[in-house]
């Protein structure tokens, strides 16, 4: 059997979907240690609760009011020496025999870890792209409005000034525009590396760890 334990606060997992109230089980990524050797992060199937609440050793709380999506159950989980069967190790990429011997078809720990969490990485990359796209759309609207909307007389008594001619308006928007440009370039670079790894064009341990 394995023992799942989060001995300190930083080992807890926060903002888990269905973690605070509804989830009955979870795939827990934890360091796999056998015979005193840490084989890196692996995935374990862990039951969380039954109809009466959390199972022994499992704890969790709701993450409280968020900035949005408060209809979604988000919570934190922690474990106090929860024992699970050896067969609860999701062992496609690494397995442990009854005597504690570890084997894996992927020799490199970095490559093994990236292979296991590849789907999660893809989700993070997509989230980054969505955030950049949202920033672009918001700034496009704000800057376009600022170049068309006129307000207050300045140099002319006949025609009001466009908002973007005011320094205060520029100072609020242009730094955000520069940051969004930088984020967009960084995201494009990330996508290139991500595609190189997953397509096999440049699948190295260094790129996987990056």
Regions of interest found by a model, annotated:
Residues 2-3, 195-206:
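Amphipathic, small/basic residue-rich leader segments at the start of a protein or domain
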Residues 5-59:
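A short core secondary-structure module
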Residues 55-81:
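Flexible, small-/acidic-enriched active-site or ligand-binding loops
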Residues 118-200:
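Extended amphipathic alpha-helical segments enriched in small hydrophobics
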Residues 209-210:
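Charged, glycine-rich active-site and insertion segments that engage polyanionic ligands
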């Amino acid at each position: 059997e394995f023992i799942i334990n989060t001995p300190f606060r930083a080992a807890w997992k926060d903002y888990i979907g269905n973690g605070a109230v509804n989830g009955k089980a979870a795939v827990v990524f934890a360091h796999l240690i056998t015979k005193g050797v840490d084989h890196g992060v692996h995935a374990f199937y862990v039951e969380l609760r039954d109809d009466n609440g959390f199972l022994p050793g499992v704890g969790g709380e709701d993450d409280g009011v968020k900035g949005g999506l408060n209809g979604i159950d988000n919570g934190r989980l922690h474990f106090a020496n929860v024992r699970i069967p050896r067969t609860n190790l999701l062992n496609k990429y690494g397995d442990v025999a009854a005597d504690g011997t570890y084997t894996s078809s992927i020799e490199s720990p970095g490559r093994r870890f990236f292979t296991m969490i590849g789907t999660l990485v893809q989700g993070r990359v997509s989230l980054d792209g969505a955030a950049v796209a949202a920033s672009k759309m918001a700034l496009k609207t704000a800057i376009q409005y600022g170049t068309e909307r006129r307000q207050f007389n300045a140099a002319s008594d006949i025609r009001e000034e466009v908002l973007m001619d005011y320094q205060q308006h520029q100072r609020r928007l242009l730094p955000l525009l520069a940051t969004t440009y930088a984020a967009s370039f960084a995201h494009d670079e990330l996508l290139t590396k991500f595609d190189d790894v997953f397509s096999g064009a440049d699948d190295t341990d260094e790129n996987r760890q990056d």
